[in-house]
Amino acid sequence: MARYMLLLLLAVWVLTGELWPGAEARAAPYGVRLCGREFIRAVIFTCGGSRWRRSDILAHEAMGDTFPDADADEDSLAGELDEAMGSSEWLALTKSPQAFYRGRPSWQGTPGVLRGSRDVLAGLSSSCCKWGCSKSEISSLC
């Protein structure tokens, strides 16, 4: 009787997965833990992979010949460009870059905005290292 109880206990233990080989190697339920260089490589692979370039090429091919008469207008546009470059406004802007930027808000006035994406990256990298993250979370950085 004790022998059957021991076999029953052993069977329950095996069925719960405690003795299966690979039970220790299961992935974390949240995602893959990536720290340091591995996190950066995963971001580069996800954001700069061939999938993104391929989608750009396919989108361009799908557009096809959207502007068939663009070549005919090219000569007239080139003439207008030469005329505009000879104007006094263009010459004033090329001689004085400050005149172009006068009256526009400076990027130096909002340093918090520039650091925002960097803070998101730092937060996601530390959480990916501690708890793991999914590919969709990494692709949110693209």
Curated annotation (Swiss-Prot):
Organism: Homo sapiens (Human)
Propeptide: 55-118
Presence of keyword rRNA-binding: no
Annotated gene: RLN3
Database matches in InterPro entries: Insulin-like (IPR016179), Insulin-like_neuro_ligands (IPR051777), Insulin-like_sf (IPR036438), Insulin_CS (IPR022353), Insulin_family (IPR022352)
Family the entry assigns: Belongs to the insulin family.
Function: May play a role in neuropeptide signaling processes. Ligand for LGR7, RXFP3 and RXFP4.
Protein name: Relaxin-3
UniProt-listed PROSITE patterns: INSULIN (PS00262)
